[in-house]
Every structure is written in structure tokens, then in C-alpha cells.
A protein has these predicted regions:
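Hydrophobic transmembrane alpha-helices
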Residues: 3-8, 13-17, 29, 33, ...
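Interfacial loop-to-helix junctions that mark the boundaries of transmembrane helices
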Residues: 19-21
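Membrane-helix interface "capping/anchor" motifs
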Residues: 40-49
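Juxtamembrane helix-capping/reentrant segments at transmembrane boundaries
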Residues: 48-59, 101-124, 185-192, 262
């Protein structure tokens, strides 16, 4: 429903107003986010938003391709983002057993913010991530809508854009197996032996890869990297500290932190 609402909003704005496509897309994205937020309120569960994070980018690119058409380069960019979205959605589905489950971070925010939680829920859990992901997918959308030409250096970043979700998937499987064993402590299997947050590292890599592939195809416009930079800041200053703080409750965390890189 949110996706359909977003597409309707985009078409409605384009038909009635002469805004630039970037602004029209942003308005439609925010409108869809409001729909998701309303459902999260109805179900009393902010985790309703989580799959929107992974569905939003491929849908935006697919709509752009349907309206504008695309070169092989544009379709490969879309395929990389679609692969990323499928991996992230599959991991969410694996963890989300029912509406009784809610991400621990949202539960923590609700406990800490009290009566202000509805505002924090909308601005912090729903709107802010939507804006970050919008900025992340904007470079690839620009490639499609402006018909940017492929350049040889783009091949490197396209390869990395496929590698990032591949390694994220590997990290997911390793973590799921560790949790099934129920041995407690810290996961030190595979990628987790080298990094405390390999999934976050690959998420950062993913959007720098998409951003840089688009950056070089579009004559090195620096603003195209704003999304990758914002996404990196989100993980470095919010996601990683929150996860480490939660892990710090376990015995031996200080030693584990010394032995294992953050990313």
C-alpha cells in the first residue's frame, strides 16, 4: 500500500506541478513513509518500517526504468540494488516471526523517550532513515533518468556493489548459525572473526559503490556522494555505538573489542 501510495503521489505531483523530479520523488517517498508510519501505529510496532528500508530503493529504480528506459549500465545498477534489497528483506523475514517482535533498538527508544516516543518514532525511526536511503539511491536514479554513459572505472564499483550484499548474506548465515547453537558470548565465525559488524561494513560499502559508479558516470558531481556519506555517518555514530553498548553487557566484551575490528 505504501509503495502504491508513493507512486500515485509521484504521478499526481508530476501531472500538476512543474517541480524537478528530485523534489517530486522526495515528496512521494515521504508520503509513502507516512503510510508506513500509520500502519506502525496501528500495529503498535515500529518494526513495520524495516522492510520499507529494503523495498524502497529497488522500487524507485524500477519506476525510473519503466518511465525512462535504461541502458545496460542502468539495468546492472538496478540489479545490484535489487540483489541488495532481496538479501535485506530475506534477513528481515527470517527474524520477524510475528508482530509481537520489535527491534530491540525501538523498544529501548520507547522506554527512554516516554511521552515523546510518537515524535521520535516518526522522525527518528521512519523519516530520517527514509531521507538517508533516498539520498543513497538518488545517484542511481540520476544515472537512469539522465541516461548516463558507462565508463570503464564504473565496472570496479559495480563489482563491489554485488560483492557487498553477497558478503552481507554470508555474515547473516554465520550469525544465524551462531544463535542457533545458543552458546552465548560473541560470534567469532567467518567474517565475524575479523569484524564486530561485517554486515554494517558491507552496507557502507554497498552505497559507496553505487554512489561512486554513478559519480564517475555523471562527470564527478560531488553531491551524488551525499547519500553514501550520510549512510556512513548513520552507522558510525548511531548503529555501531548502539550495538556495541548492548554487547558490552556481556562478560569479556572489552577483550573482544580489543581483538576484533569495528568494521
Amino acid at each position: 500500500m505504501a509503495i502504491a501510495g508513493g507512486i500515485f503521489c509521484y504521478d499526481w505531483i508530476c501531472a500538476r506541478h512543474d517541480f524537478c523530479w528530485q523534489l517530486s520523488l522526495l515528496a512521494a517517498d515521504v508520503f509513502a513513509t507516512v503510510i508506513v508510519f500509520l500502519f506502525s501505529v496501528i500495529f503498535g510496532n515500529a518494526s513495520v518500517y524495516d522492510p520499507y528500508w529494503s523495498v524502497q530503493p529497488p522500487v524507485i529504480l524500477l519506476v525510473a526504468l519503466a518511465r525512462r528506459g535504461g541502458s545496460p549500465f542502468a539495468w546492472i545498477l538496478f540489479a545490484a540494488v535489487l540483489f541488495w534489497g532481496i538479501r535485506l528483506t530475506a534477513n528481515w523475514r527470517y527474524n520477524f516471526k510475528s508482530f509481537e517482535y520489535q527491534d530491540w533498538r525501538y523498544v529501548m527508544l520507547k522506554e527512554k523517550t516516554g511521552v515523546f516516543y510518537p515524535l521520535i518514532n516518526f522522525l527518528g525511526i521512519h523519516l530520517f532513515p527514509t531521507l538517508v536511503v533516498y539520498l543513497c539511491v538518488l545517484p542511481a536514479t540520476t544515472v537512469i533518468l539522465e541516461g548516463a554513459a558507462f565508463k570503464p572505472i564504473c565496472a570496479l564499483f559495480l563489482l563491489l556493489a554485488f560483492a557487498a550484499p553477497t558478503f552481507q548474506g554470508i555474515a547473516d548465515i554465520q550469525m544465524h548459525r551462531f544463535r542457533k547453537r545458543g552458546s552465548g558470548g560473541f560470534c567469532r565465525d567467518g567474517l565475524w572473526k575479523r569484524s564486530r559488524h561485517p554486515n554494517y561494513a558491507c552496507e557502507i560499502l554497498m552505497w559507496w559503490s553505487v554512489g561512486l559508479a554513478s559519480f564517475f558516470a555523471l562527470d564527478m558531481r560531488l553531491l551524488l556522494l551525499a547519500g553514501a556519506a550520510a549512510n556512513t555517518a548513520l552507522f558510525l555514530f548511531v548503529s555501531v555505538p548502539l550495538a556495541d553498548k548492548r554487547q558490552s553487557r556481556k562478560p569479556g566484551f572489552d577483550e573482544y573489542k580489543k581483538q576484533t575490528r569495528m568494521l
